[in-house]
Regions:
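Active-site microenvironment for binding and transforming phosphate-containing groups
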Residues: 1-276
Length: 276
């Protein structure tokens, strides 16, 4: 079995569960629990629209993953993820005896923050960027889904601003961990995406390295992960506190769900982070 471990992450394969953990966040394992759950035999798709069989399997998969990392799966809260820039502060769970999945209160929401213990913030992806944030000083966490639309709307910056306004977090204290996602090597787009990206980020110093014309094609490669890193540093995060797993979901589609590879019927991975 391929091992994706590197200087920033460890790849755990245990009891039929595969997940990634960030070495930096493991330094605070007495305060937080976290993981990025993966594996093509697991599917963290939580929408009821896919039927009870898919939903019940997802609940079981969440239970298995959460058990491995010391979280009660009932603590999970997940936004509806509609490619918005909206962040919601979770002050308490809505359902005491079951998962807070796809709640009306989390519609038009793609990121969550909290300073409460035993609330496990969850997001899912199949190529989109997921970012887990942690302020060890204020003891605040966030979990953000940033697809290409979310990145264009700077949702990661919105999360930092929400942490500042709600909990007085100092950006220099915030750690941001970037989960597996599609990378520049495979994120190739047409002008309908390239043009708004260039217009939004044209002032970035390295824009010509972040948006690159594909030779002999009417397409462009965009480094959405690189853009997130730069705009997070612009709002005060330290370079050493932005931890990238460096893993492309398409390049590693034998282990990680990828919409571009799986197409219809694609599965989802999940990022989970909880304050103890």
């Amino acid at each position: 079995m391929k091992d994706l471990s590197n200087e920033n992450i460890i790849h755990v394969n245990k009891n039929g569960i595969q997940y990634i953990q960030f070495r930096k966040l493991l330094e605070y394992k007495d305060i937080i629990s976290h993981a990025y759950g993966m594996g093509l035999d697991r599917n963290y798709r939580t929408s009821r629209n896919n039927g009870d069989i898919v939903y019940n399997k997802s609940v079981n998969d969440y239970n298995d993953l959460c058990t491995e990392i010391g979280i009660n799966y009932i603590n999970c809260v997940k936004p509806c993820q509609e490619h918005t820039k909206n962040i919601r502060n979770v002050k308490q769970k809505m359902n005491k005896g079951k998962l807070d999945f796809e709640q009306d209160e989390y519609k038009a929401t793609d990121g969550l923050i909290t300073n409460q213990s035993n609330i496990a913030l969850s997001t899912t992806n199949a190529d989109c960027i997921l970012l887990m944030f942690f302020d060890p000083i204020k003891k605040v966490i966030a979990n953000v889904h940033s697809g290409w639309r979310g990145t264009l709307q700077r949702i990661s910056v919105n999360a930092v601003n929400k942490m500042k306004s709600e909990y007085e977090c100092n950006p220099k204290d915030i750690i941001c961990c970037i989960c597996p996602s599609i990378r520049m090597c495979h994120f190739k787009v047409h002008s309908d995406v390239q043009e708004p990206y260039f217009n939004e980020f044209r002032d970035l110093k390295d824009i010509d390295d972040l948006i690159v014309s594909v030779p002999n094609e009417d397409r462009w490669s965009i480094d959405t992960v690189g853009i997130n890193k730069i705009i997070l540093k612009q709002v005060g995060l330290k370079d050493e506190n932005i931890i990238d797993c460096g893993i492309c979901s398409v390049c590693n589609s034998d282990l990680i769900h990828s919409y571009r590879v799986e197409k219809e019927g694609y599965g989802l991975g999940t990022a989970i982070i909880e304050l103890k």
